[in-house]
A protein has these predicted regions:
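Glycine-rich phosphate-binding loops of nucleotide-dependent enzymes
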Residues: 2-242
Length: 242
């Protein structure tokens, strides 16, 4: 597979805190990669660096062979990087379909084309009954689906998911993991931050682990579950994979 994203010695310092400290990894096109670690490990800061929300103190970010270190969020979106947030941030003055149309307009010339694309995505994501509904009627689970739909409507090459399982019921988690697992089939590469570990451990083939700003492990889920360094740092005991 072709390399899509390279992170090279990426560092971000806030005062005396090294929130991200010399992180290196490569993501290939079509990968579905988990990123785990406790609160404060540096995951959100890493996302902010990749998405252009903040500039690194040192290091480089390369997307599709082009260095994009320090780019602006709108440049990231145009280049095909999308992200979601743990707490969904829809446009509450717009209905469900128009929230997705806003994203779809990035790559469609007319509102009609964008609306058709948005409707197709919402149908695929189980939101066909809510196209014209106001945001206020959506449950947490449906809001999370909308958040993913908005990201997919940007036609991203890479999407950064941030705890999309938070607040979901076990049934909703199973359904959402199916949606996430389907995205590489749409040509979308995924990095997925998650604290609902059973969801991520049973869905991805590769997991990266951050601790105190550093990447301490990068391996298959079954190996991560038995890695003594990971167990000691986060879990205190061996993690079940199934």
């Amino acid at each position: 597979m072709t390399v899509l994203l390279e992170v090279k010695n990426l560092t971000r310092i806030f005062g005396s805190l090294r929130a991200v400290n010399g992180v290196n990894f490569t993501i290939r096109e079509g990968e579905l990669v988990g990123l785990i670690g406790p609160n404060g490990a540096g995951k959100s800061t890493l996302y902010n660096l990749i998405a252009g929300a903040i500039r690194p103190t040192a290091g480089a970010i390369v997307l599709n062979g082009m260095e994009v270190t320090g780019w602006k969020p709108y440049n990231a979106a145009k280049a095909g990087v999308a992200r979601t947030f743990q707490i969904p941030k829809p446009y509450r003055n717009l209905n469900v379909i128009d929230n997705v149309v806003v994203s779809a307009l990035m790559h469609h010339r007319s509102v009609a084309e964008a609306r058709a694309a948005a409707e197709g995505i919402l149908v695929d994501f189980g939101l066909s009954d809510y196209l014209e509904s106001p945001i206020g009627v959506l449950t947490v689970g449906l809001l999370k689906r909308l958040e993913v739909a908005r990201a997919v409507a940007l036609q991203p090459r890479l999407v950064l998911f941030d705890e999309i399982m938070a607040g979901l019921t076990p049934t909703e988690v199973r359904s959402m993991t199916g949606l996430v697992a389907s995205l590489p089939g749409r040509g979308i590469t995924v990095i997925w931050v998650e604290h609902v570990l059973y969801a991520i451990m049973n869905t991805v083939r590769r997991i990266m682990v951050m601790h105190r700003g550093q990447l301490i492990a990068d391996d298959a889920p079954e190996k991560i579950a038995k890695d003594p360094t990971v167990i000691k740092a986060y879990f205190g005991e061996e993690m079940p994979v199934a």
